[in-house]
Every structure is written in C-alpha cells, then in structure tokens.
C-alpha cells in the first residue's frame, strides 16, 4: 500500500534497492544499467524505478539529503515494500591526504554527530555498521574489476556547512575515510527493522586541499561505483 512518500504497491520494488541521494541519479542508474525499467515512484520528485540487471530484479530509489530524509525512505522501503537489502551509493569528501579524489570508499562503520541513533537506542551509543556479507561482496566485486577500494569508518555529519572545521582534524586523527550525511542513520534504520545495508561512496571533494572532481571525472567514477554495487548483488545471490 502506498505511503505518504512512496506511491507504489507491495511487489513494485525488488528486494534489493540501490539508493543515491539525488533522484535524477536514480533515473540515470535505471536508464544506464538496468533493463525492462519501469518507474514506481514520483512523489515529491523522489523518483524510484524497478528493472533487471543481468536478469536479476533490482530497484533504484532516491533518498534525498541528510539522515532524516534518508531514514524515511529506507524505513518505508523495508516495512511497506519488502526491501531486504539497501545499498546507498553516493559521494563523500576526504579529510585525509592518503584518500584521494576518485577513490571508492566502502563504509564499514559510520560515526556521526547526529543523535538519531541515541534516540532509537535509549540514549546509548549504537555501533552503526554495514552488513558484513555486503561489505565482503562489494570488495570482491571491486577486485574482479581491478578497482581499488578503501574500507573503514566514515562520518555522517548533520550540517553540510559545518561551523566547526576543527572536527575534521579529529576525523583525520581517528582514520575517518570520508565525510557524508546519511550512513549512520541509514545503518540504524536497517538494524531497527531487520534489513541489510551498505554505503559505497566515491570521493568527489577533498576538504583539506579544496580539490574537486570535474563533471566528467565524477561521472566516470560514479559509474564504477554503481558497477561494484550491482555486481556485489549478483555475488550475494550465489
């Protein structure tokens, strides 16, 4: 049954959903990588699609920016539309000199300055982590394509324009691979409702050096990340 945010029915979404933040990215993924595509959501312009990749049903759905928006769509996909596996595919910024532009980062764990997981976990710390099998399959898929990936902790910030740049020094000290805005809450939702989740990001900006990918570089690296995500799903079916 449709929700206030998704005008679809049970069965419209596959059990595996790739989730970029930008709904136009969802459209691009569906049109570029999937076959037999049909649109299954357009509420508030948050586009969702279902198709097949090498014969395997897969859906793609935007989630917007930040933990609150991402959490709404992730929760409803799980509880109202039967999603079992959610893979966030997005971009992140680097705070480390050894994590470069175009690197692909797999978020094994996600730190955050958000309180959402403390709210759901009775004010205790919750270790927001990805599903191990999804991490392993993504690493194996990247190796098969000779794409180097970095695996470790990322950081989900509440504020894109942070008033405390010293936080980046602490992130670097603790080995944070990338900074984004969703993964910690995304993992919390998956844990609460019994689904598996993974975040894969490409480094599009370097917070220290102020380097940024060109539009062409961003697209090429984005495609590599999507290929890793899709191939990892096939590995998970074996």
Swiss-Prot record:
Q: Which reaction does it catalyse?
A: a purine D-ribonucleoside + phosphate = a purine nucleobase + alpha-D-ribose 1-phosphate; a purine 2'-deoxy-D-ribonucleoside + phosphate = a purine nucleobase + 2-deoxy-alpha-D-ribose 1-phosphate
Give the EC number(s) under which this enzyme is classified. Answer: 2.4.2.1
**Gene Ontology biological process:** purine nucleoside catabolic process
Task: Tell me if Transport is a UniProt keyword of this record.
Answer: no
Which residues are annotated as site, described as Important for catalytic activity?
A: 218
Intrachain disulfide bonds: none
Q: Which GO terms describe its cellular component?
A: cytosol
**Can you provide one Gene Ontology molecular function annotated for this UniProt record?**
purine-nucleoside phosphorylase activity
Locate the residues binding phosphate. 21, 25, 44, 88-91
Q: How does it assemble?
A: Homohexamer; trimer of homodimers.
- Give a short account of what the protein does: Catalyzes the reversible phosphorolytic breakdown of the N-glycosidic bond in the beta-(deoxy)ribonucleoside molecules, with the formation of the corresponding free purine bases and pentose-1-phosphate.
What is the protein name given in its UniProt record?
Answer: Purine nucleoside phosphorylase DeoD-type
Organism in which the protein naturally occurs: Photorhabdus laumondii subsp. laumondii (strain DSM 15139 / CIP 105565 / TT01) (Photorhabdus luminescens subsp. laumondii)
